[in-house]
């Protein structure tokens, strides 16, 4: 009986605190590749720059790196990504940050209860440059682990 209760408790904790999602796009490559499983923590919706958010957009679950939070102003210029007037440089991003022709107009200020996300694979990412800020209510959680599924 104790073993059954322990197993039930583990299942309940995992179900309410954590989640798993298969990511079927290349927006976050190489950090998260097409087909990878992402484990996320559901209970903490406070994001800082650099966190990876797992969220629903257009009926599918995807991921993006948080670059701005409520109150921040995002601009994309010929110099690249700017947050609150400061150029952002990251050794982990291998591509220039550019605007999309049919995307949102910049600069944009992130509203209360929202985040602005970009994919690490900037040329192929479907991110806030296209659909704008993400409402926290659409966020499933904060990514905490990536499980590679290639070859499984």
Model-predicted regions and their roles:
Residues 2-17:
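Hydrophobic membrane-insertion alpha-helices, especially the h-region
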């Amino acid at each position: 009986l104790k073993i059954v209760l322990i197993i039930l408790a583990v299942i309940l904790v995992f179900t309410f605190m954590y989640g798993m999602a298969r990511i079927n796009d290349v927006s976050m490559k190489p950090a998260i590749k097409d087909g990878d499983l992402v484990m996320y923590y559901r209970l903490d919706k406070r994001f800082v720059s650099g966190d990876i958010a797992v969220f629903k957009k257009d009926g599918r679950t995807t991921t993006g790196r948080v670059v701005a939070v409520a109150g921040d102003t995002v601009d994309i210029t010929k110099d690249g990504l700017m947050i609150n007037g400061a150029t952002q440089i990251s050794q982990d991003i291998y591509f220039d940050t550019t605007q999309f022709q049919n995307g949102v107009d910049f600069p944009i200020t992130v509203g209360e209860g929202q985040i602005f996300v970009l994919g690490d694979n900037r040329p192929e990412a479907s991110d806030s440059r296209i659909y704008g800020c993400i409402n926290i209510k659409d966020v499933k959680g904060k990514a905490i682990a990536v499980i590679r599924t290639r070859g499984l």
